[in-house]
């Protein structure tokens, strides 16, 4: 035992006076560590002690208040585009990490231990360590909330009939607007006239389409009068289509009227012959003499 203590004392550094013996160099090191811990962390966001009603160190110089310094620092960061870009980049990285976690799903709370015998670890210590970790995992699994991994996710809630009808009406209106726009675009394309290079126009175009809200009025000289129809050269009255019986009756009436007219003319001629005197009979070749 004395040899082991001497070996430990020989292995220990010169600054320490053994494992349990407090010495002067060890106390100095503890003082240095205490000073390092007491010193504030470097950086603009270090916590400063609030001094209330304290006498200034220098009477000629007055320190800037803490709040004012914070406001000035925040304004300086806003003016500096590099810090803003860095802040945005950090926010984007954090957001992407959260999205990845949500995509992967909830990680298991209990980590599965992996056993491997360490270097210079005895078999007994290795078995004891495995038993401790196994007991710890069993304890965590017992106190963990009940899980149901075999249960499937709840089906999505179907849309109500009212919502379906509303979406259908909205889709119909959108389709109708698209059709109206397409018709208007086609109408604009039809109304647009493409004039070729070197084309000659003899007269302005005639507008045949009427305005929507206009009242149709006949212009002077363009009224459809009966006299214009009669005087027009191409206006020939077309015979009306009648039946065969009607045509036979009309033909008989026409023939009777013609026969009556001929009989009347013959009777008038006979009366004239009886009333007028007959001229004297002259030999052929002689003309009647004229008396003065």
UniProtKB/Swiss-Prot annotation:
Biased composition (Polar residues): 234-243
Presence of keyword Phosphoprotein: yes
Ranges for region Disordered: 1-94, 139-183, 205-243, 263-292
Biased amino acid composition, Basic and acidic residues: 57-78, 155-164, 173-183
Keyword hit for Cytoplasm: no
Coiled-coil region list: 156-194, 247-276
Protein's cellular compartments: Chromosome
GO CC, any one term: nucleoplasm
Highest taxon of the lineage: Eukaryota
Protein name according to UniProt: Coiled-coil domain-containing protein 137
Protein's organism: Bos taurus
């Amino acid at each position: 035992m004395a040899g082991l203590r001497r070996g430990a004392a020989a292995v220990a550094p010169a600054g320490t006076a053994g494992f349990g013996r407090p010495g002067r160099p060890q106390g100095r090191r503890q003082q240095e560590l205490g000073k390092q811990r007491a010193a504030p962390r470097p950086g603009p966001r270090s916590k400063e002690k609030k001094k209330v009603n304290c006498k200034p160190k220098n009477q000629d110089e007055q320190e800037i208040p803490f709040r004012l310094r914070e406001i000035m620092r925040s304004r300086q960061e806003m003016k500096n585009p590099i810090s803003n870009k860095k802040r945005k980049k950090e926010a984007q990285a954090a957001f992407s990490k959260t999205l990845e976690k949500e995509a992967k799903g909830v990680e298991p709370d209990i980590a599965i231990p992996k056993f491997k015998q360490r270097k210079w670890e005895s078999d007994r210590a290795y078995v004891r360590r495995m038993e401790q970790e196994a007991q710890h995992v069993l304890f965590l699994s017992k106190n963990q909330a009940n899980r149901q991994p075999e249960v499937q996710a709840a089906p999505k809630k179907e849309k109500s009939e009212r919502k379906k009808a509303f979406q259908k009406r909205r889709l119909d209106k959108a389709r109708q607007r698209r059709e109206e726009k397409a018709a208007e675009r086609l109408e604009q394309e039809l109304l647009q006239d493409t004039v070729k290079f070197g084309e000659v126009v003899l007269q302005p175009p005639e507008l045949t389409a009427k305005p929507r809200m206009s009242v149709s009025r006949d212009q002077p000289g363009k009224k459809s009068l009966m006299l214009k129809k009669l005087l027009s050269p191409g206006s020939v009255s077309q015979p009306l289509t009648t039946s065969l019986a009607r045509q036979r009756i009309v033909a008989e009436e026409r023939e009777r009227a013609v026969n009556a007219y001929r009989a009347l003319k013959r009777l008038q001629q006979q009366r004239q012959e009886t009333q007028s005197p007959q001229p004297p009979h002259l030999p052929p070749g002689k003309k009647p003499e004229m008396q003065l």
